[in-house]
Amino acid sequence: MQVFSMEIAGRTLTIETGRVAKQAGGSVLARYGDTVVLVTATGSKEPRPGIDFFPLTVDYEERLYAVGKIPGGFIKREGRPTEKAILSARLIDRPIRPLFPKGFRNDVQVVATVMSVDQDCPPDIVGMIGASCALSLSDIPFEGPIGGVLVGRVDGKLLINPTMEQAEKSDMHLVVAGTKDAVMMVEAGANEVPEEDMIEAIMFGHQEIQRIVAFQEEMVAVAGKPKREVPLKQINPELEQAVREYVGDKLRNAIQNPDKLSREADIQAVMKETVEALLPHFPEEEKDIRTVLDTMEKEIVRKLITVDKQRPDGRKMDEIRPISVEVGILPRTHGSGLFTRGQTQVLNVCTLGTIADLQILDGLGVEESKRYMHHYNFPPYSVGETRPMRGPGRREIGHGALAERALLPVIPSEDEFPYTIRLVSEAVESNGSTSMASVCGSTLSLMNAGVPIKKPVAGIAMGLIKEGEHFSILSDIQGMEDHLGDMDFKVAGTADGVTALQMDIKIKGVNREILTQALQQARKGRLFILDKMLAVIDKPAAEMSPYAPRIITMSIDPDKIREVIGPGGKVINKIIAETGVKIDIEDDGRIFIAATDTEAANKAVRIIESITADVEVGKVYTGKVTRIMNFGAFVEVLPGKEGLIHISQLAEERVAKVEDVVKIGDEVTVKVVEIDKQGRINLSRKEVLKANKPAVTGGARPDEMRRRF
């Protein structure tokens, strides 16, 4: 067993190897504060046959024992990964994937199991560092190591791995990963932070990453295994030459077709023709012929952009595709927006619910629920394909979370807008950057629904083609540029600053110059898109949809909650039955009343106010007789509150029998004459009758005399 440690932000990171999971290719027990994550990395001995990609799998396993919880439900064990676990797995996958040899086809599986959680020390960051350590110590050919940190900013001061208390005050949540030389991955949510400040935060994080990488290099020198020799996929040089000679300029001409579907059809036609022509000369090598064609396609696109400064669809480097904006296209939904950018189209729908509709979270974090959520769907027809539809995959969950994070800073607080908000983005057409189109569509549907968002938000995806020291930054990348390029850098924000960032790259890092130019170009594009959106809808609708619930909030004394609910829910169920509203009661006394009919909601408010009102001595009430005894009648003066009219207080004259004056169900006006020490209410009908007795004929009442003067 060997143990290595270093300090990060005043807390000790300890990497232990050689004690746990020794049969894995590489394994470490990573501890940061009281957060402990077991990370293993294992590679298959032989390449997987018949594939043209690198089969890397990253699993992030949350164990609820890490926070002292027993899983809910009947089975009482962890089930499918939570959304947070999927996002954490993606966070680990993205910076390590570009760092394996080209042509490496062996299966590699990284498993990060969270075993103990200290809320001040993020387990996903520990898992990321642990994954790099496990791969670097193993015999798997990994070209790392990498480091990862969380950057926050409180009162203008940048912080590494902020504590939970600091994170609550921070105006950014920025995850940075990279090698000692360059940034590999960025994932951020921010509260309208200027682009220049985001660059500073990224580079600040990278300085700490360089320390973490140096620490791992020292560790590998002591405890690392020799890297195994693995066969890398090689193409027959004769086959490659034959393909290139046969294709000539055919592929270049096909690539320069500006329409996606026509271009794809033209490219497929060239590929089919080439395969049919060369397969007799190179039997059983169809896959390799297609691989060479794919390589040529990538080379042509990259040369067009970097040398000829021409994009496949003819746009300039910073030109954005034609934009179309529509709102309110679905009649019965609470809000809807259709955002179209070129051949990318997203329909976003906003649904408003009550506080009872919020999402309950059962994970390792301290957050137990959320009232704003965004879900993203990517059906196969959006790209003209067929495939089974079996629920959201990792990509869809990641895109939904990114769009959710982009809008979070502008969502009104619960006090300002007491609704649960669900957004759903349907990517109905895709040619690149549907996640950023989802951000734009979200703004449209929120404003169409009448949600008082603080500012509109738009998003844009930037691309990069880098050849040596030369690079080109592309605005609003389409599918081909994303697939064949080196970077997908998504930026969302308002006119005043960035609210979300996500950067994935396929090369071994990007520097400050590239990041700066990409963010500056993204801002220009974002403002252009915002102008197009605001020309159609420039502020939230004044009136909500008639099909959306109207929510009225009120507060009562928490001690009176039981009076509103009643025994076995009798009182509250009666209110719901009478008014048709939906009622949610919080422990602090806040009551949310929801109804599509405002008058019904107001009626429920009046009933609750009467239930929680205190009966006052000397005040006159009108109520119904509920019970008759031989000594008097009980009258309900307020809902759930009864008082007694003693037989002697029923009338001015002597009453022999209670039923001679009142019967059950009669409405009577009474005055509260006493509330005794036991809380019993004594009423008088006699006092009311006396007060209402006509004045003596011929005389003037004092109040009338006053009015005469």
UniProtKB/Swiss-Prot annotation:
Annotated ranges, domain S1 motif: 618-686
Binding site for Mg(2+): D482, D488
Cited function: Involved in mRNA degradation. Catalyzes the phosphorolysis of single-stranded polyribonucleotides processively in the 3'- to 5'-direction.
EC number: 2.7.7.8
One Gene Ontology biological process: mRNA catabolic process
Protein name: Polyribonucleotide nucleotidyltransferase
Catalytic function, reaction form: RNA(n+1) + phosphate = RNA(n) + a ribonucleoside 5'-diphosphate
Gene source species: Heliobacterium modesticaldum (strain ATCC 51547 / Ice1)
